[in-house]
Curated annotation (Swiss-Prot):
It comes from Homo sapiens. The keyword Magnesium does not apply. PANTHER family: PROCOLLAGEN GALACTOSYLTRANSFERASE 2 (PTHR10730:SF8), PROCOLLAGEN-LYSINE,2-OXOGLUTARATE 5-DIOXYGENASE/GLYCOSYLTRANSFERASE 25 FAMILY MEMBER (PTHR10730). A motif (Prevents secretion from ER) lies at residues 623-626. Belongs to the glycosyltransferase 25 family. Changing residue 475 to I: In a breast cancer sample; somatic mutation. The gene is COLGALT2. This is Procollagen galactosyltransferase 2.
Length: 626
């Protein structure tokens, strides 16, 4: 009988539950308030955005100690969630400390990325059949293809949405590159990368045997005369594969397709695989994405590869910020020097800080030590200052293109160079380099200039001024080559004072000419002083015109910008008339022929005699050469 009350209670609870279920939504607890009673709307949470697709970045590095810090810096700065990125890294056959640098970086960043796979191989240091570290024997092609295949296999096993293949000497300076490529929605797509020539990471034509084919489209795309995303038969070096696309399952790097009969070359093998899979490759040039060097020939050295990197860096700085190295690796310090000169002067207007900063960084990357000369600002010159200096324009002078008189900007430029000549005399500097702040440097500038000066010393040439950058104005006849000194000619009529080497005797002659009372633009004054100016009336005002002037051939520096180009700016052309500060000039936009590119030099007027004959090594073909 004791169990009956418990059974009765259980039965009562069951009846209550049944009643509540029958009432459905009408049943309420006393403490619950109806939303209709207090006027509050129910909260509806929006859907969150999709996460970014997952990307595996495959990096193969060999003898890349010099490129890795900047390459990894660019990789770090990609505006893409690192938690959605995996790093697949391999290195082998190194004679430098590539492995140590890569390992240091991976150790420091592995917590940032979703996944890191590291495949180092310390031995051997070279392939048995290679002639140098830049040579690609068959064994190297095979090894690289196997590594790429392993990376592709890992990406598939990890269910990555994309795989990005990128060479360690390709620098993605545009942080949006990965997002932009994904947005193209192509199975295989590459960003067009820039070099110091026409070379890039794509082909527009391919022969039936798989070799490079020249096409008109290539230059149109490479020079941005056509922009977009173009179907091409070949992309290489840096490209993105969408692994979500069904056809991507058919892609392979190794072994080559069973029907493959073309050259055993990694980029050609993969292009064939893409074709057999029915996948179109695409090349995009809608934006500026980054840079790559021109590949070296098989016989070239790692030192030349380092020089290639330096040139890529300094070219990138002309219109864009510097490529900074990774914050997660140690960087080897640089040790600037004066290249054997007593002094190197860089002339810069104080208000042109952007030019000064770019030039200082550019020179530092080349390990060149300079002294900044604060230029005389033509905009700050007034009439009383000109009178105090006894400055008068040479009678009858007119700009050869616009027929205008001298400008205060040109006077400021002259005074800036004059101050350098005075310092050369005061300090008794025997050999001095002078450069302006708006120049771009030729590839291997430092090595070439030092070699030229060594050759001049060995030949015991009597010189006083040597142009290293100029605009040659006499273009119908060749200039006279200097015997026993390669790459040097006797200078004819020239414009521009971008850069020159001057001796103590040369500075003394220029200052001793007392040019203030008969002033010309400095680049007209110099040809007068070496007696090559075509206007005889100007020369009459200067009795002594025996300056010994020469020029490097080919030139070693050029302007960063020319008339009409984005970024072009002139502080000499845009100014005021020399003796009337109320009359402004704006010649750089309408009449600045002086600042335009070098005009065409007649074929029979080229300074070919000054060039050394090519060696057999210079003619070794490169698989990527255009």
């Amino acid at each position: 009988m004791a169990a009956r009350p418990a059974a009765t209670l259980a039965w009562s609870l069951l009846l209550l539950s049944s009643a509540l279920l029958r009432e459905g939504c009408r049943a309420r607890f006393v403490a619950e308030r109806d939303s209709e009673d207090d006027g509050e709307e129910p909260v509806v949470f929006p859907e969150s955005p999709l996460q970014s697709p997952t990307v595996l970045v495959a990096v193969l590095a060999r003898n890349a100690a010099h490129t890795l810090p900047h390459f990894l810096g660019c990789l770090e700065r990609l505006d893409y969630p690192k938690s959605r990125m995996a790093i697949w890294a391999a290195t082998d056959h190194n004679v430098d400390n590539t492995t140590e640098i890569f390992r240091e970086w991976l150790k420091n960043v592995q917590r940032l990325y979703h996944y890191v796979e590291w495949r180092p191989m310390d031995e051997p240091e070279s392939y048995p059949d290679e002639i140098g570290p830049k040579h690609w024997p068959t064994s190297r092609f095979a090894h690289v293809m196997k590594l790429r295949q392993a990376a592709l296999r890992t990406a598939r096993e990890k269910w990555s949405d994309y795989i990005l293949f990128i060479d360690v000497d390709n620098f993605l300076t545009n942080p949006q590159t990965l997002n932009l490529l994904i947005a193209e929605n192509k199975t295989i797509v590459a960003p067009m990368l820039e070099s110091r020539g026409l070379y890039s990471n794509f082909w527009c034509g391919i022969t039936p045997k798989g070799f490079y084919k020249r096409t008109p489209d290539y230059v149109q795309i490479r020079e941005w005369k056509r922009t977009g995303c173009f179907p091409v038969p070949m992309v290489h070096s840096t490209f993105l594969i969408d692994l979500r696309k069904e056809a991507s399952d058919k892609l392979t790097f190794y072994p080559p397709h069973q029907d493959y009969t073309w050259t055993f070359d990694d980029i050609i093998v993969f292009a064939f695989s893409s074709r057999q899979a029915g996948i179109q490759m695409y090349l995009c040039n809608r934006e500026h994405y980054g840079y790559l060097p021109i590949p070296l020939k098989p016989h070239q050295t790692l030192q030349e590869d380092i020089e290639n990197l330096i040139h890529v860096q300094i070219e990138a700085m002309i219109d864009r910020p510097p490529m900074e190295p990774s914050q997660y690796v140690s960087v080897v310090p640089k040790y600037p020097d004066k290249m054997g000169f007593d002094e190197i002067f860089m002339i810069n207007l104080k208000r042109r800080k952007d030019r000064r900063d770019r030039m200082l960084r550019t020179l530092y990357e080349q390990e060149i030590e300079v002294k900044i000369v604060e230029a005389v600002d033509g905009k700050a010159l007034n009439t009383s200052q000109l009178k105090a200096l006894n400055i008068e324009m040479l009678p009858g002078y007119r700009d050869p293109y616009s027929s205008r008189p001298l400008t205060r900007g040109e006077i400021g430029c002259f005074l800036s160079h004059y101050s350098v000549w005075k310092e050369v005399i005061d300090r008794e500097l025997e050999k001095t380099l002078v450069i302006e702040d708006d120049v771009r440097f030729e590839h291997q500038f430092k090595k070439k200039l030092m070699k030229l000066m060594d050759n001049i010393d060995q030949a015991q040439l009597d010189w006083e001024l040597i142009y290293i950058g100029r605009k040659r104005m006499q273009v119908k006849e060749p200039e006279k080559a200097v015997p026993n000194v390669a790459n040097l000619v006797e200078a004819d009529y020239s414009y521009w004072t971008l850069g020159y080497v001057i001796s103590l005797e040369g500075a003394q002659k220029l200052v001793g000419a007392n040019p203030f009372g008969k002033m010309l633009p400095v680049d007209e004054f110099l040809p007068v002083m070496y007696n090559k100016h075509p206007v005889a009336e100007y020369k009459e005002y200067y009795e002594s015109r025996d300056l010994k002037a020469f020029s490097a051939e080919p030139l070693l520096i050029y302007p960063t910008h020319y008339t009409g180009q984005p970024g072009y700016l002139s502080d000499t052309e845009t100014s005021t008339i020399w003796d009337n500060e109320t009359v402004a000039t704006d010649w750089d936009r309408t009449h600045a022929w002086k600042s335009r590119k070098q005009s065409r030099i007649y074929s029979n007027a080229k300074n070919t005699e000054a060039l050394p004959p090519p060696t057999s090594l210079d003619t070794v073909p490169s698989r990527d050469e255009l």
